[in-house]
Regions:
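Catalytic/RNA-binding core of pseudouridine synthases
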Residues: 1-142
Length: 142
């Protein structure tokens, strides 16, 4: 098994001109040689840490499903499935998902906040988890 890992790693390095990192992997390639050979590629999540300020009241921290339809979409929510038009989670997630070509974003906020409060000062810490990002290096200053 170790020899096969070494051979596959060397081939990937030569083909992609990238150095294989065995300790902190961005991508894991599983090769199953029992019976019919199978290759499975696992793209590990990308974690982005930051702080946000909320300068306007009326924006929830996380996406809030419509109380009537529970997120499915109805006349009351204008078929959006959302109680509120936008959230801090969506405002942060959408441009990052687009930049990374990720599959899904998961917002991890440090603490909760009411919808009618501001978040001033040094900001509220958060971690944004991007699942299956195709692009891992992005300009966060943009």
């Amino acid at each position: 098994k170790k020899e096969l890992n070494r051979i596959i790693g060397r081939e990937i390095e030569n083909t992609l001109e990238k150095e294989v990192e065995f300790e902190k992997q961005d991508i894991v390639i599983n090769v199953d040689l029992r019976k019919e050979p199978k290759v499975r590629i696992q793209i590990n999540p990308l974690f982005i840490e930051g702080k946000y300020n909320k300068l306007v009241r009326g924006i929830p921290q996380t996406k809030w499903p419509c109380g009537k339809c529970k997120g499915k979409g109805c006349e009351e929510c204008n078929f959006t499935g959302k109680q509120y038009r936008e959230s801090v989670e969506e405002l942060l997630s959408e441009p990052i998902l687009e930049a990374t070509n990720g599959w899904q974003a998961k917002f991890h906020g440090a603490g909760r906040e009411d919808i009618d409060v501001l978040m001033l000062g040094s900001g509220r810490p958060f971690v944004l988890e991007i699942k299956e990002p195709k692009i891992r290096k992005i300009n966060l200053d943009a």
